[in-house]
Regions:
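Substrate-binding pocket helix/loop in short-chain dehydrogenase/reductase
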Residues: 96-109, 204
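Short C-terminal tail/terminal secondary-structure segment
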Residues: 2-3, 146, 235-260
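C-terminal substrate-recognition "lid" of short-chain dehydrogenase/reductases
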Residues: 117, 212-241, 246
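Active-site helix of classical SDR
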Residues: 120, 157
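Alpha-helical segment proximal to the catalytic Tyr-Lys
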Residues: 125, 169-174, 232
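Conserved glycine-rich cofactor-binding loop
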Residues: 18-19
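Residue(s) in the substrate-gating loop at a strand-loop-helix junction
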Residues: 141
Length: 260
């Protein structure tokens, strides 16, 4: 029997699901037949569509408990269930740890750690009442697993998100599976602002064993796998989607011509 991912008749909520990585996640679920509700603070400039189908957009600040409650109630009123949640909303601007304010650090942690917990709590309450339960995928980052200069609070928050994932997987089992998808560098508009032109993107790609940055669709496909029945025995896991990580610097030296 062929292995297939089919989300027909399934309802998926994707936070931050209208741009960049989030749009890639939304497209993956649309391609697999899901009804996708994508929330963000503002709608996308470009329609998020796949296989002739489009997302349903809802405006929501995921840091606001009341707004999250309204969002969940809207989804339930329209569809009667929530089968999968992908916590993708997050991010951080560059700021050195010694120079950023207390308020700046607090806001970064709020968006990247506390907000995913807030949304997960609201959706878990729904999933626990459903006969088939549900699954949650938290989008994390390699910044939480190695030094993250310039985004210290972000890296700390993502490390916390990975820890949170493993805890929720225990607390909310067996009805709800919870997993973390740890992304590496992804080729988006924001990454190009950070890395510069194509030559800058290519230079970063050369530091990755697979030779390129991830695409939003790479992340989306892996998120869909974690949410799917193919991963029905996977919970509390951390899936690294980083192209092999970062090539150690000594490997470049090891290719030098030492024959002379």
């Amino acid at each position: 029997m062929a292995l297939e991912i089919d989300f027909t008749d399934r309802v998926v909520l994707v936070t931050g699901g209208v741009r960049g990585v989030g749009a890639g996640i939304s497209r993956a679920f649309l391609a697999a037949g899901a009804t996708v509700i994508a929330c963000a603070r503002r709608p996308a400039e470009v329609a998020v569509e796949k296989a002739g189908r489009a997302i349903e957009f809802e405006s929501c600040d995921v840091r606001d408990a009341d707004a999250v409650g309204v969002l969940v109630e809207k989804v339930l009123a329209r569809h009667g269930r929530i089968d999968h949640l992908v916590n993708n909303a997050g991010g951080a601007p560059f700021a050195l740890a010694a120079e950023a304010s207390k308020n700046f650090h607090a806001k970064i942690v709020e968006l990247n750690l506390l907000a995913p917990l807030l949304v997960a709590q609201a959706v878990n309450a729904v999933m626990q009442r459903q006969a088939e339960g549900g699954s949650i995928v938290n989008i994390s980052s390699v910044s939480g697993q190695r030094p993250s200069p310039g985004t210290a609070a972000y890296g700390a928050a993502k490390a916390g998100l990975d820890s949170l994932t493993s805890t929720l997987a225990v607390e909310w089992a067996p009805k709800v599976r919870v997993n973390s998808l740890v992304g590496g560098s992804v080729d988006t508009e924001l990454s190009r602002l950070h890395f510069g032109d194509q030559s800058g993107v290519d230079a970063v790609g050369k530091t990755i064993p697979l030779g390129r940055l991830a695409t939003p669709d790479d992340i989306g496909n892996c998120a869909a796998f974690l949410a799917s029945p193919l991963a029905e025995y996977v919970s509390g896991a951390t899936l690294l989607v980083h192209g092999g990580g970062e090539r150690p610097a000594f490997l470049a030296a090891s290719t030098a011509d030492v024959s002379q």
